A protein has these predicted regions:
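Extended, charge-rich alpha-helical interface modules
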Residues: 1-75
Length: 75
């Protein structure tokens, strides 16, 4: 995988994680209720699933596409 593709995907997955963290924080702190998403725990569970998938993808990328341990620590 070339470096530009690697970094682009990494940023995508990191942005997904940040987005989910923000949404979970908003749900819990601001008591925001979205009419079509009244099940707050269900919505938080969906967001956690999305985060887990993004983290798994980052881990796979680091495992298979980072050349050495020093590079893995930088990312």
């Amino acid at each position: 995988m070339n470096e530009m593709l690697f970094r682009t995907l990494l940023k995508r997955y990191e942005a997904t994680i940040e987005d989910c963290l923000y949404k979970i924080q908003s749900l819990s702190e601001n008591n925001i209720v979205i009419p079509e998403h009244v099940d707050i725990t269900g919505e938080a569970d969906k967001l956690l699933q999305i985060m887990a998938e993004a983290e798994d993808k980052v881990a796979v990328m680091r495992k298979y596409y980072v050349k050495n341990k020093a590079d893995k620590n930088v990312l």
